[in-house]
Amino acid sequence: AYKLVLNQWLLSLFNVKRFEDLAEHLRNEALEGLDENNVHHFHHALTAQLFNLTQLPTELLLEYDQNIVRYTQRLNERRITRGEEPIVWKYFQYLTLLFTEIYLERYFSDPKTLLAGLNAQVAICNTDKLEPDQIAPFDEQAEAWPQLNKLAFWMATGSGKTLLMHANILQYQQYLEKYGRRRELNRILLLTPNEGLSQQHLREFETAAISAELFNKDGRGLFAGQAVEILDIHKLKDEMGDKTIAIDAFEGNNLVLVDEGHRGASGGEEGAWMRFRNALCEKGFSFEYSATFGQAVKGKP
């Protein structure tokens, strides 16, 4: 149910109620790519339809668009040098990145107000629900950011979630930098359900020219804290072993990326990996990506 709350809150900033109300203006494939000023056509299409947004003035949406252009150029540098196909975002990928910009800006600048906004949305969602079905609000007395430091993306297989993950890393680094917190980040960790997927991610990071390495428990590599460290979730345990790593070996301020994390967990392990994920990003942040755990939201990108 929380997924609906965040989704509905984001849509409310655009003065719409359904994702479709935004998407319908952007579906035309002719809108993919940039204009002569390096602004996404999507940006123009959105602001032409949705002007006078009090929460999202056009100049702010343009700032977010230019951030997205910058991340995309960074991810395309090596692709273009090698003569490979550059990334051109589809409308739903662009909206995902735009939503992430909006969320991260508010998370870093004013988490208390972000939490209050989400709670207002919870109250709206609860108006027509019986008590057992109501969503529990966030705790406004407790510190806000630890309640807000996890974002989950439900995306169909083949919808480019790896490309979005790469952009999300750059987005998170941009907002750490903007708010003077870059030095606080300990590690960037990518948790995968198996060794095969770890190797695949390593190759894809190489294509994007993002420093990455398979996690080595016997010593942090040369680029510790700079490189993404890729780790099979089954190697995380409570105790250190020959082939496993104790969860408390990691300090808490990490950016944690979880690819299909629950898919690698049998029933009994499910609670364990969630506990590990929470411990790893306790003082940091996590992005989670899955095609499967959002089947309740059928047919939505």
PLM feature spans:
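Signature of the SF2 helicase/ATPase Hel1-core->accessory helical subdomain module
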Residues: M165-L176, H234-P301
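Extended, charged/polar low-complexity intrinsically disordered regions
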Residues: A1-E85
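Short helix-terminating capping/connector loops at secondary-structure junctions
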Residues: P146-L148, Y179-N186, A224, A249-E251, ...
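Inter-Walker segment of RecA-like/P-loop motor cores
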Residues: E206-G241
